[in-house]
């Protein structure tokens, strides 16, 4: 009996933390994933092209890198695979951010990589913020614009592709005007509480070789919302650089107006619809890079920041030992993504395990789930300190110990 009594205190003080599994996991069994060609089981090269377990393919919604970003800006583009589905799950994991194309075909003018990257980062920051607190993500087409007899789509010089959402349209005069767009509160069976709407314009907003250039301004306006840009002294002449400048706005469902002062009218033709959930769950993102022979961007990493997002970074270059090509079937990512086959109790930036006993030094925000932690019972300088568990494990251990002690006294009293 004495050995039994001594066993439980020693158990309580001897247990050590478990090293977390590094990579995305889920807690609720209600998880959706946004991937790319590396998670596309319909490819001819599958499964040799996959970075994820083959039986997890149905949970992935995307088949091309950065397609959520491209889909908000392009309606039709032969070289892009756009997001035409929707997901309605609690936990969200992204592995789709590497693609740089069409970085040099994103504006009529040569804004280069930096401006494109800023837009991609800005979009994903807002997407993460929305996805953390809202449940369903659905891309919907908005109602067609009103008829304008003097309206024509802006056409780029050379072969560059100006994004066609928001639609950039050219007016024959500078009379202030507006076009109405509706963000519906219901799309099919999906309730839409909030929308992620792109608000874009070309800076230096005058495209004329003449001697004058009228002021330029554009805004989205409703009874409860007003956001705009105004350029009172636009540049004159075709030689000036014109960048495609975008903000990404959280807008409630309802009727809104796109108003314009100047020659250009900008109005949205599609938007991401979200509906609500009653709790906050950070999204998770896995670093997506090309092999060392190709250029990769870090927009997803820049956008994945606490408290909205947990980012899992690779520790090695993209390395393929048995894949379809040098950019598909990375060994390290396949190991990381295998965690999606199992559910967990605690998710953190350091990793996760099904039943982890974490030291306080292991965890930093954001975390979610049940994360039992060790704390110091006492700490004397120079002497040995003792760890106990500040969680249900601690309570359960000592409750069991008390029960055993009581049983011992009962047995002793019975024989006495």
Curated annotation (Swiss-Prot):
It comes from the Viruses. Residues 122-263 are annotated as: Receptor binding. Its main location: virion. Residues 264-379 are annotated as: Esterase domain second part. It is found in: Virion membrane; Host cell membrane. Glycans are attached at residues 59, 76, 257, 278, 294, 322, 343. It is a single-pass type I membrane protein. Residues 415-416 are intravirion. Disulfide bonds join 41-57, 88-136, 108-156, 192-273, 200-246, 206-213, 304-309, 346-371. The chain crosses the membrane at residues 394-414. N-glycosylated. Residues 15-393 are virion surface. The active site is at residues 37, 328. It holds the Pfam family Hema_HEFG. GO terms for cellular component: host cell plasma membrane; membrane; viral envelope; virion membrane. GO terms for molecular function: host cell surface receptor binding; sialate 4-O-acetylesterase activity; sialate 9-O-acetylesterase activity. The keyword Calcium does not apply. GO terms for biological process: fusion of virus membrane with host plasma membrane. It catalyses: N-acetyl-9-O-acetylneuraminate + H2O = N-acetylneuraminate + acetate + H(+); N-acetyl-4-O-acetylneuraminate + H2O = N-acetylneuraminate + acetate + H(+). Residues 4-121 are annotated as: Esterase domain first part. Residues 1-14 form the signal peptide. Its EC number is 3.1.1.53. Keywords: Disulfide bond, Glycoprotein, Hemagglutinin, Host cell membrane, Host membrane, Hydrolase, Membrane, Signal, Transmembrane, Transmembrane helix, Viral envelope protein, Virion. InterPro entries: Capsid_hemagglutn, Hemagglutn-estrase_core, Hemagglutn-estrase_hemagglutn. Belongs to the influenza type C/coronaviruses hemagglutinin-esterase family. This is Hemagglutinin-esterase. It comes from Human torovirus. The lineage of its organism: Viruses, Riboviria, Orthornavirae, Pisuviricota, Pisoniviricetes.
